[in-house]
Regions:
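Chalcogenol-based redox active-site neighborhoods
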Residues: 1-181
């Protein structure tokens, strides 16, 4: 598994744009290729979940969506994905009320280029519940991995991003925009 200080590997996934529930809306495609070169000069919060249409995953996705503006205020793009395809993600958005018109990017890593490049494939064949905070130079600055049965805390990811961006010493339990040492 790649860790802090490692460079984000080359990858190509199908991105599902924020706010779309259908493959095309008003003549605009919901899909766009996302690579390591996408979103230049932005921080990236890349999180993985095991499968679409499951039970824990939508709670995390919805919470990242609720916090999307706060991430964007910190020049960060949130991207959440699994190995399920892009059409599955759109169907899930239409099916689950908390994911309707989801305001953040999702991605389909059907080839495993990013899952395997980061080294986060579980023995079951799905992605581990991993989160990577990547700086604008595509260097990994934070990694967190949970077992398949435990959801993560997107608010904690926001807190960590905020602390990393201070470039200062940040104490335990420092609140978002809190004091540094």
């Amino acid at each position: 598994m790649l860790g802090v200080g490692d460079k984000l590997p080359d990858f190509s996934v199908v991105g599902v744009k924020p706010g779309f529930n259908s493959h095309e809306e008003k003549g605009v495609s919901a899909f766009e290729e996302v690579t390591q070169a996408s979103f230049p000069n932005k921080w990236k919060v890349i999180y993985f979940y095991p499968k679409d249409f499951t039970f824990i995953c939508p709670t995390e996705i919805a919470e990242f969506g609720r916090l999307n503006k706060e991430f964007a205020d910190r020049d960060a793009v949130v991207l959440g994905g699994s190995s399920d395809n892009e059409f599955c993600k759109l169907a899930w958005r239409r099916d689950h009320p908390d994911l309707d018109k989801h305001p953040a990017w999702q991605f389909a890593d059907t080839t495993g280029s990013l899952i395997d490049g980061l080294g986060i494939r579980a023995p079951e064949g799905v992605a581990l519940r991993a989160t990577f905070v990547v700086d604008p130079h595509n260097v990994i600055q934070h990694v967190s991995v949970n077992g398949l049965n435990v959801g993560r805390n997107p608010q904690e990811t926001l807190r960590i991003l905020d602390a990393l961006q201070t470039d200062e010493l940040c104490p335990c339990n420092r609140a978002v925009v809190g004091d540094t040492l």
